[in-house]
Amino acid sequence: MDVAQVRNAILRVARALEAHKDRLTELDQAMGDGDLGITAGKMAAALSAYAADEPSVADVGTYVAQAGMAVNRAASSSLGTLLATAAMRAGKEVRGQDGVDAADLARMLTAADVGIQERGKTGPGNKTIIDVVHPAAEAFAGAVAEGADVAVAAGRMLEAARAGRDAVTPLRSRVGRASWVGERTEGLVDPGCEAGVVILEAIASSTEDT
């Protein structure tokens, strides 16, 4: 996967966030302050603008990290900050490389997962985006370790991401604004989890071209 293919992945993420922003708003209104759709729109616009032109660098790591910086400037909300951190950590993992293979992508996903957990100061099981990203990263890395190609690993990543979202849906939110409404969040899809699935679906779709 070279920088042109990474650019395609970023554009797919931007389109997916824009397409799902109303759904994310609805989910967030049920258990938060209802602004996640606005954040998704800002992230989509920032990523679209960033990837609108041909990449100015061949270095995949730098290109991904700079995309994270663009998100951070445009959407400094909780989710925006977490996703910006994820991209910057992922990019740092492969800085200096003009292409990435399945093993590199596994390292990038793991770095993104660790970055989100450190920045968010929480871990799996608290009904946050981590409950999507963490199992997704583990599933991708596990598949690659078994010799799977990128497309197969991406499929397993998506299965784990969706299962992670669904597993915590019955739970009560314990982190962030959603925790303020307590038991009302039980049985509701966490908007951060849904956003994580949307993003990973877009990334996975781009691997079909590799």
Segments the model singles out, each with a brief description of its role:
Residues 1-210:
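N-terminal loops that bind phosphate or other acidic moieties
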